[in-house]
Amino acid sequence: MIAELAGVSVTTVSRVLASGADERGRWAGPETVAAILEIAERSGYRRNPHAASLRTSRSDLVGVLVPRLQDFVLATVYEGIDEAATERDVSTFVTNSLDRPELQRARTRSMLDRRVDGMIFGDAHLDDPLLDELAEEGVPFVLVSRRRGDHVAITCDDVAGGRLAAEHLIAQGRTRPAVLSGMAYASTAVDRTRGFLEAYAEAGMPLPPERVIHRGFDAAAGREATEAVLRDGPVPDALFATNDFAAIGGMGALRDAGLSVPDDVALVGYNDTPLAASGSIALTSVRSPVHRMGRLALESLLAIVDGRGAESRLLAPELVARASTGPHPG
């Protein structure tokens, strides 16, 4: 980051970059100012009018960035955000990043150019520095659904959720599971998988790495991941998918392979979307309080904008058992 490379505080960097040429000397010596400007230029920094505008005015506008609003979970998160915003006479607008860092960056800058009071990100990547850069610039923001570093985040306790799925399958006698893990850049995939693996390891049944398959979160990716599991190793007696849609795709792949759910393979999803309960074989799923996450994210952001500050929140998951994890035969 600019402050680290220049050897000064984030506050000094923020003041120098926010000031005009004739005012920068108030905050640092000429050599330090020159170093900050040079590093900022090399890193592609664009001056953000946002932080300065917050000192004098409020737009009562919040920007929201999600991977795909057509995703039921993200749509429900946004519903909670917008509901809480309406109650506080704040407007929101939302845009998709498609989980592409370059698009996330461009659309973030576009929102900031519109002088939003702050931003809510539902598309945080564990390996992308954008959020650290925004924090250095003094931009108020909150993460929702996903976490990154020590930034304020409103999430489900996904490690606990993964454990719930594992404990349920262990109680059903399932000893050879595989995991449809999602993408490694998303904390939801990482944390849910971690909780699941920890619970199985503690039960004396550690999973080999090849039993954890990283693919996307939609049904097509779930089908592809399940086909890889069936092709590359022995048939598992259980599948844990870190997303309901991936689980439903996995169910289709199992059916096409002539395997029965739950007799041959038990199946657990995550988020408990309405689709989980409506299929021909109702899906056991870990319920995540996504609507409440959205409300709390908006409330937390406004607290930060108002100078009151906010802390990260972990909301409790709940396992909803259905037909896809019926009793293990024998």
Which role fits each region the language model picked out?
Residues 105-115, 220-234:
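Short, well-structured alpha-helical segments in soluble
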Residues 49, 56-167, 171:
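Alpha-helical recognition/docking segments in bacterial nutrient-uptake
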Residues 116-123, 178-181, 212, 233-243, ...:
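Periplasmic-binding protein-like
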Residues 49, 66-76, 94-103, 128-129, ...:
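Hinge/beta->alpha junction and helix N-cap segments in small-molecule ligand-binding domains
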Residues 1-57, 329:
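N-terminal helix-turn-helix DNA-binding module of bacterial transcription factors
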Residues 5, 10-15, 54-69, 168, ...:
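Short beta-strand segments enriched in small/hydrophobic residues
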Residues 227-330:
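Flexible loop/turn connectors
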